[in-house]
């Protein structure tokens, strides 16, 4: 089994286990994961370095009470400045970065980059 499929199997096992967690434990875990994602995005992605500023306090902690102040990302934002959305680096265990393109049928074709796990999640969600 490839490393990618081993990682997918671990995610599946985790989901099967965590579906039975108490709501408070699940919420705590989700907030912890969201904090890691926000810190990575702010540190590595030019667009998010600026746009996430309202939720970060001076000490680096995150104020989720200001979440409503974050700008809504629009498709044209991605189309007009795709390089601003590219992470300078991704965690090594996330694998190779690949590019995908949309058809542009909406009038705003988008070119984006993702790792294999992110691409699989994108395919799995409606």
Where are these regions (language model features)?
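Nucleotide 5′-phosphate-binding alpha/beta core
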Residues: 1-101, 107-126
């Amino acid at each position: 089994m490839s490393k990618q499929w081993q990682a997918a199997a671990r995610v599946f096992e985790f989901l099967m286990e965590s579906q039975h967690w108490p709501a408070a434990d699940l919420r705590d875990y989700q907030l912890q994961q969201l904090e890691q994602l926000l810190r990575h995005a702010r540190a590595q992605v030019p667009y998010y370095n600026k746009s996430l500023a309202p939720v970060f306090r001076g000490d680096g902690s995150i104020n989720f009470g200001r979440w409503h102040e974050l700008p809504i990302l629009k498709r044209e934002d991605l189309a007009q400045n795709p390089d601003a959305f590219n992470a300078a680096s991704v965690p090594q265990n996330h694998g190779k970065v690949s590019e995908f393109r949309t058809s542009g049928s909406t009038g705003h074709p988008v070119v984006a980059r993702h790792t294999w796990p992110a691409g699989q999640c994108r395919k799995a969600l409606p």
